[in-house]
Regions:
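Secreted/periplasmic serine-hydrolase-like ester/acetyl group-modifying domain
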Residues: 125, 134, 138-235
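Conserved small/polar residues in nucleotide/adenosyl-binding loops
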Residues: 236-243
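N-terminal Lys/Arg-rich, disordered targeting/topogenic segments
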Residues: 1-5
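Generic preference for well-ordered secondary structure
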Residues: 39, 91-95, 203, 207, ...
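Membrane/wall-proximal cationic-aromatic binding patches
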Residues: 30-93, 99-110
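Hydrophobic membrane-insertion alpha-helices, especially the h-region
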Residues: 10-26
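Short secondary-structure boundary micro-motifs
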Residues: 8-9, 42-43, 51-53, 198, ...
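Membrane-embedded segments
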Residues: 74-152
């Protein structure tokens, strides 16, 4: 009888802890998987690079905006405030360091599906990515944040790294009443860099002359396939939806 009592008590405590952890994660929701920002509650967009793919889907689906800046790390220092000043629109920035064309295209599609009122996408297109396979994707995307499957959300709710870094920093922001991270600062590394002619020349090495690579039919087909599937297709789909 005592063993049964201890078993039931252990199960009860375990369930209570799991429910409490779930409630905290859903309420704070550092990656905006369940909801957008809550008015009066500051949030922190932590770091850049590896963390971007965790934040971006929630930003695209649950923030209120009219325009989006997206692309690879080349767009990380783009300033959302400049877009807002030029076109008088609410702007978010969702960059994917090393992102492939298909990865970014899939992100834009999910974002537009959740925000029909978006009027402008400013998208960086890296020339070298056009040479990749049109279906190239990153090796470790957090798919559990991209879909609507509640069962695989255990990977988010009970993720140790999520508790130790983004959730902890969000709680700190709330406690200390910091201002939320702006989309000028999110992903940006420019404040940590020094820009000058002297700095550039100190790291410059003149490249050796090389023969110009031949523009083959294989290269042409790769570029065309990328453009058709990961750029132009979305434009045609959007135009058809507007008609």
């Amino acid at each position: 009888m005592k063993a049964k009592k201890w078993l039931l008590m252990t199960l009860g405590i375990t369930m209570a802890v799991l429910v409490a952890m779930t409630a905290v994660m859903v309420y704070i929701d550092p990656y905006f998987h369940y909801h957008g920002p809550v008015e009066g509650r500051p949030y922190m967009l932590y770091g850049s690079g590896a963390y971007e793919k965790y934040y971006n889907d929630g930003i695209g689906k649950h923030f209120k905006y009219d325009a989006m800046i997206t692309g690879s790390s080349v767009t990380e220092n783009f300033m959302a405030s400049q877009v807002e000043n030029l076109w008088q629109c609410r702007t978010v920035k969702t960059c994917f360091a090393g992102g492939t064309l298909r990865e970014i295209d899939e992100h834009v599609k999910r974002s537009l599906a959740a925000n029909a009122g978006v009027s402008m996408i400013i998208r960086g297109i890296d020339e070298d990515k056009l040479l990749n396979d049109k279906d190239a994707m990153p090796s470790d995307p957090p798919e559990y944040l991209y879909d609507n499957n509640l069962f695989n959300d255990v990977n988010y709710i009970f993720n140790k790294d999520t508790w130790l870094i983004p959730l902890r920093y969000n709680l700190q922001y709330m406690r200390e009443n910091h201002a939320s991270t702006s989309f000028d600062n999110y992903s940006s590394w420019s404040v940590k860099a020094t820009f000058s002619k002297k700095r550039t020349l100190s790291q410059y090495e003149r490249p050796q002359k090389q023969e110009e690579a031949a523009y083959t039919q294989e290269i042409h087909d790769s570029i065309q396939a990328n453009i058709d599937q990961n750029i132009v297709c979305l434009l045609y789909t959007s135009d058809a939806a507007d008609e």
